[in-house]
Amino acid sequence: MADLLGIVAIVFFYVLILVVGIWAGRKSKSSKELESEAGAATEEVMLAGRNIGTLVGIFTMTATWVGGAYINGTAEALYNGGLLGCQAPVGYAISLVMGGLLFAKKMREEGYITMLDPFQHKYGQRIGGLMYVPALLGETFWTAAILSALGATLSVILGIDMNASVTLSACIAVFYTFTGGYYAVAYTDVVQLFCIFVGLWVCVPAAMVHDGAKDISRNAGDWIGEIGGFKETSLWIDCMLLLVFGGIPWQVYFQRVLSSKTAHGAQTLSFVAGVGCILMAIPPALIGAIARNTDWRMTDYSPWNNGTKVESIPPDKRNMVVPLVFQYLTPRWVAFIGLGAVSAAVMSSADSSVLSAASMFAHNIWKLTIRPHASEKEVIIVMRIAIICVGIMATIMALTIQSIYGLWYLCADLVYVILFPQLLCVVYMPRSNTYGSLAGYAVGLVLRLIGGEPLVSLPAFFHYPMYTDGVQYFPFRTTAMLSSMATIYIVSIQSEKLFKSGRLSPEWDVMGCVVNIPIDHVPLPSDVSFAVSSETLNMKAPNGTPAPVHPNQQPSDENTLLHPYSDQSYYSTNSN
């Protein structure tokens, strides 16, 4: 039977978040204020007009990473493998720091709108669309995974239907994201992070004083855990590198970086948010340690609802460590506060992922690939439709797919294996080209898929060294990533040499990126595509070659120079 008091508490929390989201959305400038600035309306919705201060940026960056899966996963990992098995908090914290060092300043200085802009700027629109596939899958499955975690938590503590709780949470997050854009997402993240921090810390001491909970300091060796032998250490390192570098190429990260007022602020929020992720992992880690050192026979917990009690949580129930601690080791009112914390964590991540996927579709797919002449109003409408569609897809997946965590895990692998080397090369390797990018994409994808994924019942078509009992202990993910990066470099350099030396005829340059550059890739003052082609975002032809500048063209600032919407009024009157 549903707990009415708990439902009232959750409804109050949801109403609070909704009100804050609507209020924050009103901070956006009106359409009249934005008419004089080319591209300003799009930036206002997608990036809050690049007006997010460092403090708010730190809060929203931290809140996005500290989602429901982060909290539940940290507690579960510590319960199963101890502190050494709890890699996500440390991995994601280092990931934020590395992102700040490698990409935050460079990407913000270039004035990009999304993570995919440098790909379309250098390789062309179609490559940007190809990079969108793993990015979209990752964001959507991530949203579905955290919604599923919330539904399971609400069903355990409140006894309400999982479908109803997931649908309601998704609708609220989608609604304020739809109406308020990035402003709503950023400011609700501030409230949600506060709720997460307070809610979890209220629950920890309450759980510690339960009669069944033992003093965790007396059994430190038990909850610290161990990695294992050489094979296990190899797998541990592979997974840690996946978290560190695979956590960078996500639009949710770059949305915060690119919305910062300055490039220095973008770096600062990355560094400080990394520390914030570590601090926010302490409460769920303690919850996992408490659960690991609890004699569950001294509680009312019966995993099979038949009166049978167990000393420890069964393996198939350990993904519910956090809600079980709330339910059986804390007073009722404390459990409701903890539930609010988990709900806040889920919504702070879900809204960000939905907006990120929708922004990439509207800007990189619709505007730069499908409809290059689309107005800003049309792009914003498309983005809002995409917000609804992504929200619906994630909700359906959360309700229907049993192995949603497995799908998200596989997508996270693909982001690490495919997108990270691509992003590193497009930013730091001036001679990389479309041929290298395509070859690297294919190599990374194949090497990862042949390794299999048990979580989604994908068999291993190739047994890497140390393959034992269905487990790939060899660091094949990192091997695939490095192979992809090496392929990008080698194919790019060799293709350039072959074409420029004359060994290959220019007609064979079918991608038009070395010597056979199509006429529509060269900016012409009489062509509207001059204002919107991704190859002219920085007034350069593909692969960084300086492009001719029209004598009547006015100088542009840092952002408008790179902006596909800049000076459309000029081209609309001079393109006939």
Curated annotation (Swiss-Prot):
What the entry lists under InterPro entries is as follows: Choline_transporter, Na/Glc_symporter_sf, Na/solute_symporter
GO BP field: acetylcholine biosynthetic process; choline transport
PROSITE patterns xrefs: NA_SOLUT_SYMP_3
Q: Would you tell me the Gene Ontology cellular component terms?
A: axon; neuron projection; neuronal cell body; plasma membrane; synapse; synaptic vesicle
Which regions face the Extracellular side of the membrane? 73-82, 148-165, 214-233, 292-319, 400-408, 459-478
Q: Where do glycans attach?
A: 306
Predominant subcellular localization, coarse grouping: membrane
**Record protein name field:** High-affinity choline transporter 1
State the organism of origin: Caenorhabditis elegans
